[in-house]
Amino acid sequence: MALDWDFMFHSIPAFFKGLELTLYISFFGILLSLLVGFLCAIVLYFKTRFISPIVYIYGEIARNTPLLIQLFFLYYGLNEIGLSALECAILALGFLGGGYMSQSFLLGFKSLASIQRESALSLGFSPLKMMYYIVLPQSLSVSMPSIGANVIFLLKETSVVGAIALTDIMFVAKDFIGIYYKTTESLLMLSLTYLIALLPLSVLFVILERSFKKKVA
C-alpha cells in the first residue's frame, strides 16, 4: 500500500502544534518531578524521622499507579478544586516523576563512601553544606543516566493526556485516524514527531553524563 505523502506533508503543522503542547507539559511536569524527587531523596538519605515513612509511601504510590489513573483522580476525582486539564497533566506528571526521580537521586547519594560524609561532618560542614559541596556534585555522575532515562520515560508518558481532552501529538494522531482513516500515515508521523523530541534529549544526557564524570575524575 502506497503512503499518502501529500496527507503527511499537510499534517505537519498539526503534529508540531501537538508537539508544542507535549513539550510544554513535559517541561513543567519534569521540572516539578526533579524538585519533588530531589527533596524526597534528601529526606530518605538522611532518614528523617516521621517524614521518611511518608515519603517512602508516596514513592511507592507514585511508581506503582499508572499516570492515566493519576490524571483521572486529579481531573475527575478532585474536580471541585477547579484545576484545568493542563494543570492536572503537569501535576500528575510531576507526581509520577517525583517517585522515580527520588530513586535516581538517592542512588547517587548512596554511591558515596560513608567516610566522605563523616569527614565532611567532622570538618564542621552542616548537612546542607555537605549536600551542596560534596554529595551533589559527585552523586550526579552516578544519577545522570537514570535521570535521563526518567526524563525520556516521562515525556513518552504524556501520550495519555489526550484522555482529558488535551490535544497532544497522540491526540492529533488519533484524530486524524478517526477522521481521515489514514492509520499508517498518522502513526508514522506520530513516531517521527516523538523521535524529533526524544533523540536530542538522548544526545543531551549522554553529553551531560560524560561532563559530570570528567568533573569528578
Predicted regions and their residues:
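Transmembrane alpha-helices and adjacent helix-loop boundaries
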Residues: 1-217
